Amino acid sequence: MGLRTMGLDSPAPGAYAFGVAVNEPNLNRTFYLPRLPREFYQGDAVVHWTLSISHRRRGWLTERFHASFRELMLHAAAREGVFCPTYCLMPDHLHLVWMGLRLDSDQGNGMAFLRTYLEPKLAPQKFQHQAHDHVLKEKERRRNAFSGVCHYILENPVQAELAKEPDEWPFSGAVVPGYPTLHPLQKDYWPKFWKLFAAARSPDAGKIIRPPIR
């Protein structure tokens, strides 16, 4: 049972819409990207999220921001029952992957929570009005394919010529509660991660009905 269902939830500075903090100024839905039905972001969903900075502005990415990001990701993990096996913070956008662990996990709520509390750390910059998402299909969730998705994310700094190797970039990692030093570039990471994931995942996490993704 999550914190929200226990009645221990405390409100964020703004109310939540699906994946969007309602205190964001632009709420004209004609400007929003279409999303899959909500159930695709609930339960055992696996989603690659990309949060871009408005006008691709830079100058906010620091060790202090990174620490704040990790702290808020831990709170999101506790609230919504998610693991983040990989994230990478870039100078003008953020990548993260969330994997649901419980039937009541809701990544839409998690993303609204994260954006609401993280955006003040960007000041004076702001996020674009909506995060982009890619819900992984079944074939993308198979272990070898999934690790390939995460590797692609970690390669972003190399592709952008910000680092020669992924491990030279200081703003990437994983957020698995209780394991602060776990990092997806460690040699033994994936066997350890899958063991932790299997232990944390509720047996009913996948008992949610969704039409197939085309």
Where in the sequence are the language-model features?
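Short catalytic/metal-binding and nucleic-acid-binding patches
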Residues: 1-214
